[in-house]
A protein has these predicted regions:
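Helix N-cap at the start of a conserved alpha-helix in ABC-type nucleotide-binding domains
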Residues: 171-173
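Catalytic Walker B motif of ABC-type/P-loop ATPase nucleotide-binding domains
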Residues: 160-163
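Helical segment within the ABC ATPase nucleotide-binding domain
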Residues: 175-187
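Conserved ABC ATPase "signature" region
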Residues: 102, 106, 113-131
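Conserved ABC ATPase signature
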Residues: 135-139
Length: 204
């Protein structure tokens, strides 16, 4: 994937090149019941790779298959198969976790009874029950991340793509997220994540 740089970006990157290639000739396979990690420093192309897998940006060349479905030819079908957590996700601060869950459950066309049960399970798993009716603006950074994770997997996808899932979190919240990732693996899910934290990779 190649991006065109503005003059300001060229100055920041200290380059005269007008284009930068973020990802080139990348190939890997992630299996069921596996946590596949992309480890590298900021700017290594991890987020770009995950965004292409999640069909948020289109590769200039080549293709990727998600559960046998092309991200280039059938992006809508791919989105139904995955749960995607991006480090750039900004929750609407005037909504509550409960309202956000209901909104995204409707987007995924979930049955009402199933959505209610799923909300109870996930809110209990991440300790969100007491904050279900609190506006996002009043939540801690860790609680916002928990809500983001719940929203990304509320439709129970088999393929989970997390971009820097523990970035900026306190130790206890990071441990909760790490334990959940291992739980997803035990359930036979495919987990693909990016991180620049080597200790996280060692734990997983």
């Amino acid at each position: 994937k190649t991006f065109t740089l503005s003059r300001r970006q060229q100055k920041i990157e200290r380059t005269h090149e007008k284009k930068i290639r973020a990802v080139d000739h990348l190939s890997f396979t992630a299996y069921e019941g596996e946590i596949f990690g992309l480890l590298g420093p900021n700017g290594a192309g991890k987020t770009t790779t995950l965004r292409m897998l999640a069909t948020l940006i289109r590769p200039d060349e080549g293709d990727a298959m998600v559960d046998g479905i092309s991200v280039v030819k059938q992006p809508d079908q791919v989105r139904k198969k995955i749960g995607f957590l991006t480090s750039e996700l900004k929750l609407e601060e005037f909504f509550t976790p409960s309202a956000l869950f209901d909104f995204f459950a409707d987007l995924h066309q979930m049955d009402g009874a199933l959505a209610k049960q799923r909300k109870q399970e996930l809110f209990a798993r991440f300790g969100i029950e007491k904050f279900a009716e609190v506006k996002v603006a009043n939540l801690s950074t860790g609680m916002k991340q928990k809500v983001s994770i719940v929203i990304s997997i509320l439709h129970d996808p088999n393929i989970i793509i997390f971009d820097e899932p523990t970035n900026g979190l306190d130790v206890l919240t990071a441990r909760t997220v790490t334990d959940f990732l291992m739980e997803l693996r035990r359930q036979g899910k495919t987990v693909i994540l990016s991180t620049h934290i080597f200790s996280l990779v060692e734990k997983l």
